[in-house]
Amino acid sequence: MCAVFFAAFAGCKKGGSGEKVGISMPTQSLQRWNQDGANMKAQFEKAGFAVDLQYAGDNDIPTQVAQIENMIATGCKVIVIAAVDGSSLTEVLKTAKQKNIPVIAYDRLIMNSDAVSYYATFDNFKVGTIQGEFLKNALKLDSEKGPFNVELFTGSPDDNNINFFFGGAMSILKPYIDKKVLVVKSKQTSKAQCATQNWSTEEAQKRMENLITQNGYGPKGTKLHAVYSSNDSVAQGITNALVGAGYTKDNFPLITGQDCDKTSVINMLKGQQAMSIFKDTRTLAEQVVKMTSQIIKGEQVDVNDTKTYNNGVMVVPS
C-alpha cells in the first residue's frame, strides 16, 4: 500500500465581516467533495463569512445551475464553484458577471466563460507524474525488459484537469510504451479513449470488464501488470471488475489513484489498489478563503500562475 501526501498553498486571514459566500460542490457521493465542502465552510465561517454551501445532487448539472442562480439572487458576494461539467455554466455565470459577483473555480477549471475571476487548484500535472513514477518504479521499467501489459484510465472528458493528470502520467509512461517495454493491448492510449464520463465508478467498471474480455486478461489468461487510473472513483470501478474476473491479492495488477477515498484505502489494505495520492484540501480551502478576503477588501489577489489555465475564452489567474 502506498499513500502519497501532496499539499499545496497555505495561509489565510480574517476578513469576512459577515459577507455571504456561496460554495457550489458537484456531489456528496464521494468522500473527497464532502471533505472539501466541509473544510471550506468551516474556514470561511472562522474567517467571519456567512456561507451558503450547496451540493448538486449526484453530479446533476441543472441542480448546480439552479443553486448558483439562487446564490446570485440571495446576495452572495463571491461564489466558489467546483463544476459538475466545466462547460455547462457559461450562461448562469453571465448573470454573475453582470452583477459584479466574482467567481472562483475550485479545482476544476470552468471553461468557455469570461466570468471566472480566479482558479484555485493543485499542481495536477505533478499529480500525474507522481502516479506515472510510481508505476515506473514498481515495475522497474529502467532495469526490466518486460513487456508489461498496462491499460490506461483517466477522468471525465468535460473536466479540464484530465489534461494535466493524464498528461503528467503519460510524460513518464509514454517513452516506455514507445519502446514496447509497456504494452497497451487494447491500443487505447489517447485521452479521449481513456476518459471516464463523470469520473464514474460504474463506467470505469464497465470499460475494464470489456478490456478483460476483449484482451483475454485474467488470473489464468493474459497477465495484466498494471492499470493507470487518475483517481480513486475510477480505480474503484477497475478494482470491482478485476475482483469479478477472479483476481486476488496474490495476482492483483497495480492500480494508481488519488484522493485517498475511504473505499480505496480499504482496497489498498486488501491489496486491491497499489497507491493513492492524498491532496490536503484543507490547504486549498485556506487559499480560497485568503483570495476571497482579498477580493472583499479590494486588495490585490495573490496568484502564482497567469499563463497555464486557458479556459477557451481567457487565461484564468491561479
Question: What annotation goes with each model-predicted range?
Answer:
Residues 1-2:
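Sec-dependent N-terminal signal peptides
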Residues 6-9:
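Bacterial Sec-type N-terminal signal peptides, specifically the leucine/valine-rich hydrophobic h-region
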